[in-house]
Amino acid sequence: MNQNSIRIKIKLAHNPYEVVIKKNGLARIGEELKKIGFKKATKVLVVTNKDVSVHYGKEFIHNLSDNGFNPTLIEIKAGEERKNLATISDIHNAAYTSRLERGSLMIALGGGVIGDMTGFAAATWLRGVSFVQVPTTLLAMVDASVGGKTGVNHPKGKNLIGAFHQPKLVLIDPITLKTLPEREFKAGMAEVIKYGVISDKKLFRKLEDAPRLDKLETLTDRFLLEIIQRSVQTKAHIVELDEREGGIRAVLNYGHTFGHAIEALCGYGTWLHGEAVSMGMIAIGQLALERNIWNISDLERQRKVLCQAGLPTIWPRVCAEDVIEILKSDKKVKDGEINFIVPTEIGKVEIIKNFTVNEIKQALQKLASK
């Protein structure tokens, strides 16, 4: 494995692109844009937040300018509680002020929330302009930046407003993880663990064998590159099979159905997305155990790895009836039935939709009593 640069092709019929994992990649953004056909003088709107901008904004803009692009940077307030149409309007206002045209470009420089909102703003500005993902969090690197899902939250649920809009490029620079708060790093590890549970036994065993997963400094560069690469490859393969989530792509939502309910009920921003997904994985694991689909040994293996990553595994104090009401408005509801992504063994899940309200209540009540 080339430790300095890894390229993973996302082979879609109409919108193929590459995920480039490159050490010090931020300093090569201009060159990477030229490689995929963007010309000098192209107007570029870089969307980021204050925390990321402090560390990388100035160098990033200078590199774009030095390569002949015409960049503007906008800082928005990030966080799930700001992931709404009001913030999209702020990005659109910046696009208008910058005179972005159909041939212009938006770049998301930040975490998953920045990527989701920038992608949606790009999808809806002038009926669609190009955008590029430059994720700076582990969660965004392995999950949110790949696959073309963009959108914002609605008061009644997470990501209910959105569009599929594939990026032209995803540029991952692992160096940015050095400035990532520890809590954010741990939250991102939830998505890595998810890939192990749904599809990649080898990745799961690798995570199990690590003494701890909650601190960046305890992981070697090689280990970090490998888990990012394996996660992206898993997602790439699934997205290639099902770009618009008509079938198999739904497995990527493992842990998310209950996780989204936790975020909505506890208030966006109370739990980080990865933390909510961790608790969601615990919940669906319990539901699978109650149905005798999953065994207690694998349930415990999942719990231990989540604990190694410093992630929450205790179900929060939320009313089971309220959870069920949120579940009914989930994007994965089809013909009035909730599609659950259910583990059957480590490395394998199934889509099951015939769980009764009683089964869900019993599983949640059992979790609440632990």
Swiss-Prot record:
Domain of life: Bacteria
Pathway the protein acts in: Metabolic intermediate biosynthesis; chorismate biosynthesis; chorismate from D-erythrose 4-phosphate and phosphoenolpyruvate: step 2/7
EC annotation from Swiss-Prot or TrEMBL: 4.2.3.4
UniProt similarity note: Belongs to the sugar phosphate cyclases superfamily. Dehydroquinate synthase family.
Binding site for NAD(+): 112-116, 136-137, 149, 158, 176-179
InterPro entries, per the entry: Dehydroquinate_synthase, DHQ_synth_AroB, DHQ_synth_fam, DHQS/DOIS_N, DHQS_C
Reaction equations catalysed: 7-phospho-2-dehydro-3-deoxy-D-arabino-heptonate = 3-dehydroquinate + phosphate
Gene Ontology terms: cellular component: cytoplasm
Keywords: Amino-acid biosynthesis, Aromatic amino acid biosynthesis, Cobalt, Cytoplasm, Lyase, Metal-binding, NAD, Nucleotide-binding, Zinc
Primary site of residence: cytoplasm
Protein function: Catalyzes the conversion of 3-deoxy-D-arabino-heptulosonate 7-phosphate (DAHP) to dehydroquinate (DHQ).
Cofactors that this protein relies on: Co(2+); Zn(2+); NAD(+)
Protein's GO biological process: amino acid biosynthetic process; aromatic amino acid family biosynthetic process; chorismate biosynthetic process
Binding site for Zn(2+): 191, 256, 273
Single GO MF annotation: metal ion binding
Organism: Prochlorococcus marinus (strain MIT 9211)
Keyword Lyase: yes
Subcellular localization(s) per the UniProt record: Cytoplasm
Family matches, as Pfam families: DHQ_synthase, DHQS_C
Protein name: 3-dehydroquinate synthase
